[in-house]
Amino acid sequence: MLFSATMPGAVVALARRYMSKPTHIRAQDPGDEGMTVTTVQQVVYRTHALNKVEVVARILQAAGRGRTIIFARTKRTCARVAEDLAARGFATAALHGDLGQGAREQALRAFRNGKVDVLVATDVAARGIDVDDVTHV
């Protein structure tokens, strides 16, 4: 048996290679069409890579913004974005795999307690984050 929360191509290939007649079971609510919750608003901002931090900083200035999580592809980018936003006056913390367990817990604790309202994380490090009142991702 093989269980996976997600089914990226590598997992599908693994199942096809080593399993006989694998069955893909998808857990889904009836009527759920894979769309986001109706209360979620999705917006896309197209910008040049060199302007990303500037655009993010402007978005973070939105009125009524609560806790915000920003995802970065690499550990280096995660640390750089957190540093750049902190230099612009935002209360930020970075969360990535190069941090020790104590530093990761401290960053999450500060985010949960409101001392930091912007958490910049890699997707791997961010798994399992459960924080209330996150308004922007």
Can you say where each PLM-predicted feature lies in the sequence?
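Conserved helicase RecA-like core
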Residues: M1-V137
